[in-house]
A protein has these predicted regions:
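Catalytic domains that recognize anionic headgroups
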Residues: 1-218
Length: 218
């Protein structure tokens, strides 16, 4: 075994929230608009059979961060936060001497949701990273939301999605700001520092409005 094999590797974990497998040329030859992702995949390990553990953000990320199924970590519609007593992926990296970073505009990846434990640096562009008054409001709303029956919760969630869509996806996705912050963070990290950086990009989660150039970054 060489020295290179035993050295710690830096890890960048990128989630393209809600991006469908059948919209990537890596998995479908008829797709012709994801050339950059295709190029990246050609020099990478690609898994052909991967299944998400849940159909929405919180339980899916809770499974990623805990290595558990939703019925084990219990962060679901019934209990809309992750128990902070559980050891999360970022904490494991911390214990190995890694600096840990979470950069995302996703409200489910935030301190009030219990999903950022172990990340020393958190930026989520929604004021939810470390602002205690907002956290208190979020926890209060979450407690009330959890007490409502499932059908009513779905109606509320659908209404809020409609409100966000009226506002405009560009206002809430903040993908450009997220990518810029990731780049700035990487530039600031000392080259001798081992790091784990997690980012979640939300553009595919919202209706896509074609811009100019429409496919520059795909």
């Amino acid at each position: 075994m060489t020295t290179e094999d035993t050295e710690n590797k830096n890890v960048i974990f990128i989630v393209l929230d809600s991006l469908r497998k059948d919209k990537l040329s890596v998995y479908d030859d008829e797709v012709d608009f994801t050339s950059n992702i295709q190029q990246f995949a050609e020099n990478s390990r690609v898994y052909a059979n991967v299944t998400a553990q849940a159909p929405w953000t919180l339980p899916s990320h809770a499974s990623i961060f805990t290595g558990q199924y939703p019925w084990d970590h219990e962060a679901t519609h019934k209990n809309t936060h992750l128990d902070t007593k559980r050891e999360l992926l970022a904490e494991k990296f911390q214990s190995e001497g890694y600096e840990t970073y979470a950069i995302t505009p996703n409200a489910w990846i935030s301190k009030p949701m219990g999903t950022t434990k172990g990340f020393e640096y958190t930026e989520n562009f929604l004021g939810l990273a470390s602002y205690d008054p907002v956290q208190n409001i979020f926890e209060s709303l979450r407690t009330r939301f959890d007490s409502i029956d499932r059908q009513t919760r779905r109606k509320i969630a659908g209404f809020l999605d409609g409100v966000f869509n009226k506002i405009g996806s560009s206002d809430i996705c903040k993908s450009r700001e997220t990518v810029d912050e990731v780049k700035n963070t990487l530039q600031k990290i000392d080259e001798d520092e081992n790091f784990f950086l997690f980012t979640n990009l939300m553009t595919a989660h919202e209706p896509y409005e074609v811009g100019e150039p429409p496919r520059e970054y795909l």
